[in-house]
Swiss-Prot record:
It comes from Methylococcus capsulatus (strain ATCC 33009 / NCIMB 11132 / Bath). Its EC number is 2.1.1.-. S-adenosyl-L-methionine binds at T144, G165, D187, N228. The gene is prmA. CDD domains: AdoMet_MTases. It comes from the Bacteria. It is an enzyme of class 2 (transferase). Disulfide bonds: none annotated. This is Ribosomal protein L11 methyltransferase. Coiled coil: none annotated.
């Protein structure tokens, strides 16, 4: 068993409370959004905090959480520490726990993402085997799902594909399974590149997927460029992504909040893309367009 101690603080106090919990014997401390404030693009090298941050400390069973609460109240002032709560956590076999929540998922008419230990009965299905790991991307997030559905509906036979910000490699691997002749998977995170290589091998498309950091990307033109990252990087990368799409080729963008869609679409329209109507889901957006100039 474990114990979890949680408290809500203003953002300027979050780091200090985190340090105090660690000093009090916490095994780990994490931050959660205590309100409803999206925070998707913290500066590199910083820990994301919110205007109202929920600080969560994990302790071994038997710790005196009441004494810790009292000590923090005396140090920071009870009025600055709000909504205290405690919770007992049972030991879990985490592999079994995620399997209870991560089931085969279908995207479009034929593409499935299936974790280890499950099968898909549909004989016409295109099945990707993928388990949760270190890198982002299992298909559960709306932005990933929107991109997978686009791929399922596209004609990818013989296509050259760029997966920029590949994470787990899910989009590039899906493209290869759906018929793409070659995929360039790019990410700034070495763990993401390693995950992509392993997942591509597991799905027997490793010979069609090349991984690289942005600086090591080979010179090529793609028929389709996919970028499921965030709005600000997408706008900053517009020239770089355009240069990787052949005239007449297509671009697919996601990781964009609904209120950011017009700004991102305008940037790419100015770069010579004919943008299609946005597709919305749960506050997120997928944009797609064709390079005309």
């Amino acid at each position: 068993m474990w114990q979890q101690l949680m408290v809500t603080v203003d953002e300027d106090l979050a780091e200090d409370v985190s340090d105090a919990l660690m000093d009090a014997g916490a095994l780990s401390v994490s931050f959660l959004d205590a309100g409803d404030q999206p925070l998707f693009e913290p500066p590199p090298g910083t820990t994301p905090v919110w205007a109202q941050t929920r600080v969560v400390g994990l302790f071994e069973e038997g710790g005196d959480l009441a004494a810790i609460r009292s000590a923090l109240g005396g140090r920071f002032g009870d009025e600055r520490l709000r909504d205290w709560s405690e919770e007992a956590l049972a030991d879990q076999v985490w592999e079994r726990t995620w399997l209870e929540h991560f089931r085969p998922m279908r995207f479009g008419s034929r593409l499935w993402v299936c974790p280890t230990g499950f099968t898909v009965e549909d004989t016409d299905a295109v099945v990707m085997s993928l388990d949760p790991g270190l890198a982002f991307g299992t298909g559960t997030h709306p932005t990933t799902a929107l991109c997978l559905e686009w791929l399922d509906a596209a004609d990818l036979q013989g296509a050259s594909v760029l997966d920029y910000g590949c994470g787990s490699g899910i989009l590039g691997i899906a493209a290869a399974l759906l018929g793409a002749a070659g995929v360039h998977a790019v990410d700034i995170d070495p763990q993401a590149l390693a995950a992509t290589v392993e997942n591509a091998r597991k799905n027997r498309v490793g010979d069609r997927i090349e991984v690289a950091s942005p600086g090591g990307l080979a010179d090529f033109d793609s028929d389709i460029a996919l970028a499921n990252i965030l709005a600000n990087p997408l706008m900053e990368l517009a020239d770089a992504l355009r240069s990787r799409v052949r005239p007449g080729g297509r671009i697919v963008l996601s990781g964009i909040l609904a209120e950011q869609a017009d700004a991102v679409a305008s940037v790419y329209a100015r770069k010579g893309f004919e943008m299609e109507p946005a597709v919305f889901r749960e506050g997120w957006v997928r944009l797609a367009g064709v390079r005309r100039t």
